[in-house]
Amino acid sequence: MTAEQTLAPQERKENSYRAYKREQEVISRHKIYKTTALYATYSIIILVLAIRSGSVLWGLAFIPVGIIFWMLSEYTSHRYIFHHKFEVSEETPLKKFFTTLGVKYLDPMHTGHHERPFDGNHMSGRIRDLLPMFVIGAGLGIFFFPVAVITATWFICYLAEEWIHHATHFYNFRDPYFRYMKKHHMYHHTKQGMKYGFGTTSGIIDYFWNSRYPEHIRQRLYGAKKSIAANQAEPQA
């Protein structure tokens, strides 16, 4: 009799589940390695050029624009695209193209992530997912350097979101920010939480977009001293 066979059924189930999570964590992490290698390299080069340019302040002034652009695009895509149930429309060829794209790719991708939150194949983005945006942003950046800075900043934020999202699913933390984000995001994966908590790296934007969890849920998740994002101080309604 093997050591595995001597374990109680519950222990065998828990060991199997932990092994499954470790396996999926590796799959997800290796996908992020690839996207990080490409997009971080470009972004670092552009930001170094901005710092070394003759007009440093002018170049770096567009970093906040990139951050704001990222926060808005992350939230709106998560709430209004990934959580939208597409139906193929025959109204116009263009509308048919985009709705077919949604039905074929976007719906299965995010629905699969919610149904199997530890599936590494549905966890992290691939290089090709954002390649069109990268090509457009980097291409325009050749002629308009501020666009390159905005693109580089956006992709740095995207990579940070990918790693934070990966971490909230697979790791446990003592750090207050990550403990907060793990509770915030994992509750979003429940049936009751899917209509709230669309910010993946911060709960601040949910406050401004009126998609925070209800008060009784926040009390249960965070306790009396609720924290929001990095500063651990939630704005008062």
What are these regions (language model features)?
Residues 83, 166-170, 188-191:
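Alpha-helix C-capping/helix-to-loop hinge sites
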Residues 1-158, 191-237:
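Non-catalytic, topology-defining segments of multipass membrane proteins
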Residues 78, 165, 185:
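Divalent metal-coordination and catalytic microenvironments
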Residues 147-181, 236:
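Alpha-helical transmembrane segments and their immediate juxtamembrane interface regions
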